[in-house]
Amino acid sequence: MRGIILALLLALAGCEKSQYEPFFSESKTYVYNYEGIILNGIPENGLARSGIKLNCKVELSGYAQRSYMLK
């Protein structure tokens, strides 16, 4: 009986609909700040590595139905 209940719960959890397409309101502007580091070199002790740090500000706003403008 426990096995049947467990199987039903797993089947119910597996059939849940996932929404992968993002939804953004056309009347709002969304602002995101990204930061990243890129490192180059050989990952051995005593060897030099170089890198660069990137900062980015992204503005996303609605342009038309299902169309968005990225700045």
Curated annotation (Swiss-Prot):
Keywords: Phosphoprotein, Signal, Storage protein
Domain of life the protein comes from: Eukaryota
Record GO terms (molecular function): lipid transporter activity; nutrient reservoir activity
Tissue-level expression: Produced by the liver, secreted into the blood and then sequestered by receptor mediated endocytosis into growing oocytes, where it is generally cleaved, giving rise to the respective yolk components.
BP terms from Gene Ontology: cellular response to estrogen stimulus; response to estradiol
Record's keyword annotation contains Signal: yes
InterPro entries: Lipid_transp_b-sht_shell, Vitellinogen_b-sht_N, Vitellogenin/Apolipophorin, Vitellogenin_N
Induction: By steroids (estrogen).
Listed Pfam families: Vitellogenin_N
Record domain Vitellogenin: where: 24-71
Signal peptide: 1-15
Cited function: Precursor of the major egg-yolk proteins that are sources of nutrients during early development of oviparous organisms.
Name recorded for this polypeptide: Vitellogenin-B2
Species, as recorded: Xenopus laevis
